């Protein structure tokens, strides 16, 4: 057992491998309890504030359902539902909400915002996504890998393919080195991963037995991998010029059936944090088709819908792992 009561959950950098495994074990146990109808509520009477400066499907639903399952009440503060950063500073917001709520989730922009909330709130603060990191997603990813592979995380070979500069590349690398994994970022040289973070992760890897490889060579990067992972290439609201340059650079890095074959591993799996641009069935998908002539972006539709894809198991596990974070840091033990 680990006492994580009142701890903030801002980045996996703040946790030991044993503590991360504790979150994963707790999530597994909570998932089993939910499935069997034996869940014990450990957050009765708790009040939780959910601050979303960016829209969300999985993260919001995971926090709301997880809290409800555990007997807590939530207040959702959407992109237009609070004054944070506009009329009121993050520090002031934290001191107000910390007097009314038992825990605060933040999904938004800079990592410094969630860190400021944590500094001033006086209650546990959880990072639901920032521009630099996405730690709750990594717990869901690792729980899903545990469920699909009969070997420990430190024997997993894992490649993140695509935009090496985005928050998922950062977050996965942090989690992977903590857990001793063979981790590769396969990305064009023109989109480099943060050098300071890479250096820090290599220091951790030296202690945990992990391996970190940054390469633009797809064949070399995915060889022998158990998991191929990708994320969207561009974010909504970025200018057309960014879309054009990113698409040109990243189209060769689309994860497809051929790339799965390149792993040489018949048991390889495909993962994605979602949403994914794999067809023309969305407004964005249609716009991409009209502007750039592409029916699929970071992943082929064929692979997304194939037996190799475990993206919906991964999405479900967002709820179980987020619930574990809340129970571990706020629940009655």
Curated annotation (Swiss-Prot):
Subcellular location: Cytoplasm
GO biological process terms on file: arginine biosynthetic process via ornithine; arginine catabolic process to ornithine; citrulline biosynthetic process
Residues annotated to bind carbamoyl phosphate: 56-59, 107, 134-137, 273-274, 318
Catalytic activity: carbamoyl phosphate + L-ornithine = L-citrulline + phosphate + H(+)
UniProt xrefs under Gene3D superfamilies: Aspartate/ornithine carbamoyltransferase
Keyword line: Arginine metabolism, Cytoplasm, Transferase
Keyword Cell wall biogenesis/degradation: no
Top-rank taxon, per record: Bacteria
Predominant location: cytoplasm
Pathway where this protein functions: Amino-acid degradation; L-arginine degradation via ADI pathway; carbamoyl phosphate from L-arginine: step 2/2
Function: Reversibly catalyzes the transfer of the carbamoyl group from carbamoyl phosphate (CP) to the N(epsilon) atom of ornithine (ORN) to produce L-citrulline.
Family label: Belongs to the aspartate/ornithine carbamoyltransferase superfamily. OTCase family.
Protein name: Ornithine carbamoyltransferase
